Amino acid sequence: MEKYHKTDIAPVEQENERDETYQASNPQIDFTRTRNNYNIIKRQRSYTQFINDKIEALDLPTKVRKDAVLMCSFVVGSDREFFGRLSPSEQQQFFVDCTRFFAERYGEENIISAVVHMDETTPHLHLNLIPIADGRLCAKTLFDRKELQNLQSDFHSAVGEKWSLQRGKEGSTAKHLDTAAFKLKKMNEAADQAELRADEAESRRAIAEQRQVHAERKTKQLEDRQKQLQQNTAPLQAAA
């Protein structure tokens, strides 16, 4: 889980929604597949405007601090093997189940967005919400260490068991990764894939070179044979 302040929100929206101003610094994004991304929850306002409207509706007794956490973000995904077992419709249902879990736990009205990225190494869900409880902003208490541990356990019970996901060790990051670790994992996977593609390209290049050498050798043999035939037929033509 990642916490964001006011100035962080617009860049997160650009990355999540892949808007026209987004300049990718993430090498694993394949923009030819960006059209396959989809929203499970999408508001008709920007992230910032949605948050501002929600805070205004709270009618808080004091002004929101400049360093207040206004958005908490989760990245939910799994590995290639898991998604390889699912059909496209099953993949979509998995992310719907994930979104429903967060909506029931923290209130659908507090979810800013839920968008699935299909244009990276593996599909994954970005879910952003406003940390509101008891009518106030409270990221610190809403997502303390105990709650995050409970969240991991409850998510597995509600979603993981249904989809046969392995339960990670409590408190570990083996299966429950925060945003930065998840991105790092995906970048490493992308690097491995890029290296594999480079090896395949090098192999194809070597095969092409071998074929070229073979073709040149055959051409030379044919030219030599033709030259020999011409030399052999020259005396016959002269005698005629």
Label every PLM stretch briefly.
Residues 1-240:
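N-terminal nicking endonuclease/strand-transfer module with a His-rich metal-binding environment
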